Every structure is written in structure tokens, then in C-alpha cells.
């Protein structure tokens, strides 16, 4: 799948009619530069109705779809999220709020590869949202399971504690919406930079644009204005 096409899959999910969003934001920035050596992430966030725990679980269940196949409706619970997110990054943190509850899940290829998992293991958490911006832990109810899941977050996510996880949750302003953070972005196959490392598929160096790597080089080589250089879509 073409990388910008994968990003479009995630945008389609956020703009889906049952999502109910009026605004979808796409961003790219460096995660914890002092901790993660300047690794970029891509975020997709909407102000829709959000998901409850069951719907979040269904979204992450490969092959699951509970949607009516309406014309023009790609489907939040179809294959779009899995194919789009895993095409762009090894890891995805999904955070969502709905009906007074907050939920998150980590879909991590890095974790699965590290433990040699045969099954797709996905740590999930739920909190009850209380007055004053406080969160009350809800699920998992078993303390051992909670600690085990949090250890996965601490080892394989850019958030290294429950506090940092909830700080990320607070980026969803208000009582509903969904935020997807893609990190450990995939790199170009068979191509490396001067230090022998593979390059990212995206170029984040041009203002607020997210471009395919190569668009900027094309502009410089042809001496053309940025208005006419890119042959591919540019998200702003």
C-alpha cells in the first residue's frame, strides 16, 4: 500500500459518518527528543463520538466489521485502521473517550516481535472520567493483569507510566473523541542514508506539510516552485 494511501485510510475512518466528527487533525512531530533520539510520530485525532471498550476491542480484532456497507462509508471497524496503521508504523497507541469513560490500547509489532508471540496480544486500559479532570482506573480489574499490561506500555510505548499515558489522553479535549499516535515509523526498503540507516518514507522538513520523501528533492533538482513540484497529495 502507498504510504499516503495508508494515511488516507485513517482519515477515512475519522471522517466516517458514524464517527460523528466535525474536525480531524493530522500532525507529525518528534516524540520525546531527549529519550527517543528524535523519532517522529504521526497523529490522527478527531472530535467524534469516540469508542467504548467493546468497540475499541472490535476495531483491533483483525477481520472484524460490524458496519452496514453504506455507499461512501469506509468503516471505522473495517480493515482500514489495521492496514493503514501497520503500513505506516510498527506501533500504534489508540486513545478514545466516550460516555464518561476513557480507553486506550497499544497495537505494537515491536512488542510482538520481541516476545515471539503467535497471537496478537494487545494491552488495553479503561478509566472512569471524574470531575476535575481526574481518572479512576476501571479495567483491568485484576491488579496483576494491570501491572503486566502497564509493563508493556513502559517498555514498548513512548509513554513510560500511567501518568504519561493519561497526559496523552488529555490531548483529546472534552468528553469524546479519538486520538491515534503512530510511532516507530516504517522506513524505506533497501535505501539508506549516509550513515547506513534506512530513511523514513516521509519528509517532515517542509513547513507543516507531510510529504513523500523525494518530493523536496524533485523541487530542488528541477528548480521549480513548491507550487508545482509534488506529484503526490500533500496533507496540510
Predicted feature locations:
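Conserved ATP-binding N-box helix of the HATPase_c
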Residues: 1-32, 84
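Amphipathic alpha-helical transducer elements in NTP-driven molecular machines
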Residues: 4-8, 53, 74, 78, ...
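Alpha-helical hydrophobic packing sites
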Residues: 15, 48, 80-82
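Interdomain "switch/hinge" adjacent to the Bergerat
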Residues: 17-75, 91-93, 97-236
